[in-house]
């Protein structure tokens, strides 16, 4: 009985530590997202909207189609990584990033660089770049503006060449832009 009680205490301790680690991870993701949004003068809710929409789209994809065999853990990882989708905007000139009205073609070319900047930032994290969260965040950063017909950027990927993580976040990002003021 003593051994069982000790085992239960250890299991509770490990469980508490895992929950604390997850909470800290979520907190860091939110802090980084807020830094980018603060600089970009976005609503501050954009990243939260993207995460919620990504979760909803993934849930629908898994439940209603046979197109993807994503596990609940993979869905959670994609939703968490979605917060990094615009992290590369931190490298874009604020005058362009916050310009009211239509961008010139040259300015739009600069804005498009945020996908490559974000992917590069994540790729330079040598210590963590093999971590699943960073790999998925890289895919999302780089390819969330790709289009199924191949007319997106930065690489002009076509159809299923676009990772499912980037496809889902792309839909969430466009939807949020359409419903936001």
Regions found by a protein language model. Give the residues of each.
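Amphipathic coiled-coil signal-transmission "stalk" helices
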Residues: 3-6, 10-28, 39, 43-46
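Metal-dependent catalytic cores of enzymes that make or break cyclic nucleotides
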Residues: 37-181
């Amino acid at each position: 009985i003593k051994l069982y009680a000790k085992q239960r205490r250890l299991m509770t301790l490990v469980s508490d530590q895992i929950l604390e680690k997850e909470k800290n991870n979520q907190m860091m993701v939110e802090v980084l997202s807020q830094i980018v949004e603060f600089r970009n003068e976005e609503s501050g809710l954009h990243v939260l909207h993207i995460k919620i929409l990504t979760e909803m789209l993934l849930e629908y994809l898994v439940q209603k189609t046979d197109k993807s065999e994503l596990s609940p853990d993979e869905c959670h990882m994609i939703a968490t990584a979605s917060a990094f989708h615009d992290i590369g905007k931190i490298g874009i000139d604020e005058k362009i990033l916050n310009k009211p009205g239509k961008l010139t073609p040259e300015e739009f070319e600069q804005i498009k660089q945020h996908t490559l900047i974000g992917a590069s930032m994540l790729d330079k994290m040598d210590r963590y770049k093999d971590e699943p969260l960073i790999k998925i965040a890289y895919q999302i950063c780089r390819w969330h503006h790709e289009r199924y017909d191949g007319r997106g950027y930065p690489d002009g990927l076509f159809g299923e060449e676009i990772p499912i993580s980037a496809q889902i976040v792309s839909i969430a990002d466009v939807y949020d832009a359409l419903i936001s003021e």
